[in-house]
Design a protein with these regions (language model features):
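Modules that initiate DNA replication and primer synthesis
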Residues: 1-100
């Protein structure tokens, strides 16, 4: 799967929790979302671009966002890409769900 496909999957998951985007929750949310992107093997610059697109419109500071993403990637460096194989296209996921019923 491409980085963009994985980011889209993660975006759908992240968007389920709208409280992540309100003041008071954003710093922790950025760190956790960056961790997920890191574990999926997404390049840090792509992760920053994605997270900026989600958090800067909420008024979050760009430098603080970059700091949190860098901190998360640094802290989780040994996990970079370790969960990339867990992602599969929706059509494949849907097929496996119907076979299990």
């Amino acid at each position: 799967m491409t980085d963009e496909q994985i980011i889209k999957i993660l975006d759908i998951r992240f968007q389920k929790f709208q409280d992540n985007y309100i003041d008071g929750n954003r710093t922790h949310s950025i760190f956790i979302q960056a961790k997920g992107l890191c574990e999926a093997g997404i390049d840090i610059e792509k992760a920053i671009d994605y997270l900026e697109s989600r958090f800067l419109p909420t008024g979050y500071d760009k430098e603080k966002l970059r700091y949190e993403v860098n901190r998360s990637y640094s802290k989780n460096a040994e996990m970079f890409g370790m969960k990339r194989g867990d992602y599969k296209p929706y059509s494949e996921y849907k097929k496996s769900k119907s076979n299990s019923n």
